[in-house]
């Protein structure tokens, strides 16, 4: 018969288990340096949304930070779907990251293979009719915002400030220029025009942004 589905799934370098039971080595460079990249999307009825676009961005992030891809693209697609299909709920949040290997703390690149971490968990679809309350904050992030790195401290702090103000999201700005939000791009439709920040080192090349433009 069919294998029993799981409540959620974690994956690390070939091992699968419940997220709560998974462990990661202390010497994984994500621990010391946040030395890795990630991407994330949703599975709806076990179909991963815009997967090719997310994989394009993931492999580009690896390239920009000189992190060897943890596995070939087609193999990663297969592994992501393997994770999605192990979970009972067909609607899931799907997250994966590559880190620059494992080794004693040293800033220079280690001579070890990169690591791959994946997890998927149930995620109900959001009510798109809800209105969002926004806070604003000066954008003090560094000039690697086009890379989806594990270094998210500014977004963590911005999200906490938004919560404290009873808001849903924080809009970053550099002076008079709006860049993006703590965990989303900003797109405005005004007077029939679609307005969003140009793609450069100050914003992430968002997949939803790309699909809105297309």
PLM ranges: what are they?
Residues 80, 85-98:
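Ordered, amphipathic secondary-structure segments that act as subunit-interaction surfaces
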Residues 3-85, 104-214:
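Helix-start/capping segments and mature chain N-termini
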